[in-house]
């Protein structure tokens, strides 16, 4: 079987996806792009028919793709397309088993979240309160850092979600999971300051944080305002809401060491999601060790 014949089988598969599965043209183009790349790799390995393909050859496709600069996420898509194609060939009786079934792409490296150190957080929060919107922004910053909220949770807060007597808020997290969180004395103070001014913008809106038009503030507006305050306050790194959430988690873990507690505060379903912050904590401790411990100093 020649490369042309390999392509004919792929064309039959794409026709099946378009006619019987009724996949969108964009999805079909993505399948074709990935499978065309596989056919090119098959030509490099001397593969003459799909029936000759085994797990070792599929792994060689993966290795060659990586050498050509394909990232882990893109390689996972390529192998997924190949598995679907082979499943179809099995259903047509043209293959006995799917040779790509047990072959997976290497996992993409998990990037450690960046955080803002405590001094910079304090500098960020010490903003010039020359207008009501600045008071609102200070309250949002205090709540975001004080409770480690997601951006969607912050903009979704209603006044009814507050219990300022206990210093707590109710938030609706991912998967419609509700949780009750302490927000800290500073956040309570600045929410109260904002509530004193909030009536200048709207009186019948349920949302806690409003835009200058009196409607619930948008996530994009929050991102824009936080970035602007980061620049005004002279922070070297870009300030965005998720970075404040990361900073909350890192600083809490450094202070308490209570991974389970931080998991509950962040609303993570799995502890493994929270454990990434232990790497940040270790990096901090390692830098302190390298700077201070006599045995860590080189050449002495």
Curated annotation (Swiss-Prot):
Gene Ontology cellular-component annotations: cytoplasm
Modes of activity regulation: FtsK may regulate the catalytic switch between XerC and XerD in the heterotetrameric complex during the two steps of the recombination process.
Ranges of residues in domain Core-binding (CB): 4-90
InterPro entries the record matches: CB, DNA_brk_join_enz, Integrase-like_cat_sf, Integrase_catalytic, Integrase_recombinase_N, Integrase_SAM-like_N, Recomb_XerC, Tyrosine_recombinase_XerC/XerD
GO biological process, one term: DNA transposition
Pfam families per record: Phage_int_SAM_1, Phage_integrase
Domain of life: Bacteria
Subcellular location: Cytoplasm
Main location: cytoplasm
Span of domain Tyr recombinase: 111-290
SUPFAM superfamilies: DNA breaking-rejoining enzymes, lambda integrase-like, N-terminal domain
Active site (record annotation): 150, 174, 242, 245, 268, 277
Molecular-function annotations in GO: DNA binding; tyrosine-based site-specific recombinase activity
Keywords of the record: Cell cycle, Cell division, Chromosome partition, Cytoplasm, DNA integration, DNA recombination, DNA-binding
Task of the protein: Site-specific tyrosine recombinase, which acts by catalyzing the cutting and rejoining of the recombining DNA molecules. Binds cooperatively to specific DNA consensus sequences that are separated from XerD binding sites by a short central region, forming the heterotetrameric XerC-XerD complex that recombines DNA substrates. The complex is essential to convert dimers of the bacterial chromosome into monomers to permit their segregation at cell division. It also contributes to the segregational stability of plasmids. In the complex XerC specifically exchanges the top DNA strands.
Subunit structure and binding partners: Forms a cyclic heterotetrameric complex composed of two molecules of XerC and two molecules of XerD, in which XerC interacts with XerD via its C-terminal region, XerD interacts with XerC via its C-terminal region and so on.
Membership in a protein family: Belongs to the 'phage' integrase family. XerC subfamily.
Protein name as annotated: Tyrosine recombinase XerC
């Amino acid at each position: 079987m020649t490369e042309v014949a390999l392509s004919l089988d792929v064309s039959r598969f794409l026709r099946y996806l378009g006619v019987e599965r009724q996949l969108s043209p964009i999805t079909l183009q993505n399948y074709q792009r990935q499978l065309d790349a596989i056919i090119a790799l098959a030509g490099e390995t001397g593969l003459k028919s799909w029936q000759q393909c085994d797990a070792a050859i599929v792994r060689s496709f993966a290795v060659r793709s990586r050498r050509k600069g394909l990232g882990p996420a893109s390689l996972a898509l390529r192998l997924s397309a190949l598995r679907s194609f082979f499943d179809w060939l099995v259903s047509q009786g043209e293959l006995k088993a799917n040779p790509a079934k047990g072959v997976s792409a290497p996992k993409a490296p998990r990037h450690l979240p960046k955080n803002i150190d405590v001094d910079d957080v304090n500098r960020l929060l010490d903003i010039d309160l020359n207008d009501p919107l600045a008071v609102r922004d200070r309250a949002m910053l205090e709540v975001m850092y004080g409770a480690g909220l997601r951006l969607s949770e912050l903009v979704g807060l209603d006044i009814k979600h507050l219990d300022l007597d206990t210093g707590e808020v109710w938030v609706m997290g991912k998967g419609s999971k509700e949780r009750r969180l302490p927000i800290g004395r500073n956040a309570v103070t600045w929410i109260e300051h904002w509530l004193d001014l909030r009536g200048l913008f709207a009186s019948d809106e349920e949302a806690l944080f409003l835009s200058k038009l009196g409607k619930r503030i948008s996530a994009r507006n929050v991102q824009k305002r936080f970035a602007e305050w980061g620049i005004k306050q002279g922070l070297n790194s870009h300030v965005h809401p998720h970075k404040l959430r990361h900073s909350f988690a890192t600083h809490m873990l450094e202070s308490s060491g209570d991974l389970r507690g931080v998991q509950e505060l962040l609303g993570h379903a799995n502890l493994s999601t929270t454990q990434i912050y232990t790497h940040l904590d270790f990096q901090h401790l390692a830098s302190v060790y390298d700077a201070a411990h006599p045995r860590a100093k080189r050449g002495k």
